[in-house]
């Protein structure tokens, strides 16, 4: 049965049915295509193939309702847009701008996994710019301000992925929190004579603030502090 929180977010949905039933539960037309392994053909109920060819992203149903059901759909829209080089529909754009704050209703643990999907790819900088443009970034990284360092780091990550080189979320989160950590360190150092203690305290405070939005595994926070 479908269960929702007071905010309208769907917290449980284990209703199963036909393809026709399933398709209306999908988020975007381009993400609602089915393949018949016997007939070797694509089944398209909502015009997903047409949208793929036109490089457009339309939501299934009413955007305002669908985003309130699952706010993560907003950042999925951004990711699909950058990955496919597709344009968001006017309805999707408008509703993301209006409902960006709903992302705060999502559990920090789930947002950690979503952040990896957002930034560990060849189009991560484009994703970053779009998240900022639509007011979503601050609901993932409220301590992070746009700067050239992040741009260089994301472009470097993209280049490594293209070259089939390994990437790590340690580097990703350290970069996003670097400026906030440095600013906090400067403030603490005015009162704390020990460089090491000031650096450690600044790192811990910034990470504590971050995990309120996006959970970070303990092994990850330890390595972020090392960086």
Model-derived features: where do they sit?
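Catalytic cores of the polymerase beta-like nucleotidyltransferase superfamily
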Residues: 1-227
